[in-house]
Amino acid sequence: MNLCSSGATASTTSLSSTGQAERSGGVPGGGAEGGGGSGNSGGGGKTSNGSAEAPTLCFAGGSGTAGAIAGTEELSNANSPANGAGGATGSTGSGQQPTGSNGHSHLHNENNANMPPETRPKMVTVKHPESNKPKPTTKKSKPIQADQDVIKALQRCRDEGIKRLDLSKSSITVIPSTVKECVHLTELYLYSNKIGQLPPEIGCLVSLRNLALNENSLTSLPESLQNCSQLKVLDLRHNKLAEIPPVIYRLRSLTTLYLRFNRITAVADDLRQLVNLTMLSLRENKIRELGSAIGALVNLTTLDVSHNHLEHLPEDIGNCVNLSALDLQHNELLDIPDSIGNLKSLVRLGMRYNRLSSVPATLKNCKSMDEFNVEGNGITQLPDGMLASLSGLTTITLSRNQFASYPTGGPAQFTNVYSINLEHNRIDKIPYGIFSRAKGLTKLNMKENMLTALPLDIGTWVNMVELNLATNALQKLPDDIMNLQNLEILILSNNMLKKIPNTIGNLRKLRILDLEENRIEVLPHEIGLLHELQRLILQTNQITMLPRSIGHLGNLTHLSVSENNLQFLPEEIGSLESLENLYINQNPGLEKLPFELALCQNLKYLNIDKCPLSTIPPEIQAGGPSLVLQWLKMHSPYRQM
């Protein structure tokens, strides 16, 4: 039996309340193809020369755009949404006509709507003794079932020669066999529905080029899909596929294949047949091995196999010489093959969070790379001079590894770099002059290392904007830090600092200063010169008083001085007009608060826990910070202001 023979079409007389849509004239499918509709379901109108335009049909919740299909997927580790659950909808209740698989329900209610008012059945409310909730004896009609509307949409698609059909986000569970009649279709969007399987008749759409099936409940594909020999883009993200359906390997015209977030465990050798693929995404599956067949896909430009269970890559990966983006992050890779050096077009290589102890020296051949990221591995050192060979690098991320020193290669390796992240390693020294050529370096993260001192040439880092030195063993800051006048963020928490140099006042662009958990006893008066400061974090130190100049910090919104030895707060704190959060908890010597605190009109949060505030009645303190502020306002000499 030929599934694609026209035959008799199913009767839809009882399904249509408005009749067949009016034709706009011309030959169905003639003229220009409708592009990028906005969700309208109207047919194509005549063009200015009188020829008919092939319309685009969008349905129900569809967006009218091809948003489900992208040219490439980002090499990100963003969380993926859960799969859409499958299953039928529209269970029946008492007093309701059962709903059939074709969605022909509530027809009697539609007829009732056309009756004269005097002949319609009345809505009678009955109150049951055991319930206060009124229960109607006749149920109100529900919206037309989504699967029923699909029949209408397909009929219109057939009649008007529509080339682009968007049925996305419509709670569809079944695609009827009448889809075979939509032979003009080149784009079909069925994403974000509840489809469990496709009918064999899908193979009749021989002109199809784009097919979006992502976010459904598919476990397989019909063999007839191989008849769609012009298919270029196939999107199967977020389904329930336990394997790559064999029919896919016979779709040799495919250029883009998305299989992200399924349950695939293996890739068959037949993959080598898809020689026209330029984009392949197998992200977030359960694949343990990528066979040699991958090397046959010489036209690939983007390959995403991240978030799987790969331990090795085949040497054949080096045959994919057109790759510009290769995402291997979040696997269990123990090594990278030397053939990776053949990928001279590579711009982005994601190797984060694997089990690598080294990377091959051949990577220095990949001179087009602009980002080098091996975060979350066990690497102790990079091949000598490798970073210097990659002269196009702008960001380098070596965090969460086992580096005991900076990579070898000298200042040349950072010439064009603007961001360096070496967080969470075992580095005890920043080499003198290592950044002498890094004129564009604006961000350095050395958090969680073993630094005991900063290099003497720190004053030459004049373009630095963000400097994170938290969780080291620093005992002092050099006075030359005053030269970092572009600095906006300075993180020095969890060190062994006893004082802050007066030259800190030269950092006039500073917005965030974090000195938490040090051994600081006194803040310099020059702190008041930081007029752009928004967050000042001083908690867990040994500070006994805040300088009166703190009142000059007009942009300060967050001040934390908890867990110190404060005896009082300066009355100038009332000048902090932008202050929203104030933490002064756990200062055992703080017995009173200045009335001027009531002048901080934007203060939203005040933490005074474990402060012996003897001047404020206990019942006021027990009422919480808001009541304390109210008390201060009521008893303040400024209450008339």
UniProtKB/Swiss-Prot annotation:
Gene coding for it: Sur-8
InterPro entries: Leu-rich_rpt (IPR001611), Leu-rich_rpt_typical-subtyp (IPR003591), LRR-SigEffector_domain (IPR050715), LRR_dom_sf (IPR032675), LRR_R13L4/SHOC2-like (IPR055414)
Domain of life: Eukaryota
Protein name (record): Leucine-rich repeat protein soc-2 homolog
Keywords in alphabetical order: Leucine-rich repeat, Repeat
Function noted in UniProt: Acts as a Ras effector and participates in MAPK pathway activation. Probably acts as a regulatory subunit of protein phosphatase that specifically dephosphorylates Raf kinase and stimulate Raf activity at specialized signaling complexes upon Ras activation.
Renumbered ranges of LRR repeats: 161-182, 184-205, 207-228, 230-251, 253-274, 276-297, 299-320, 322-343, 345-367, 368-389, 392-413, 416-437, 440-461, 463-484, 486-507, 509-530, 532-553, 555-576, 578-600, 602-623
Biased composition (Gly residues): 26-47, 84-93
GO terms of biological process kind: intracellular signal transduction; positive regulation of Ras protein signal transduction
GO molecular function, one term: volume-sensitive anion channel activity
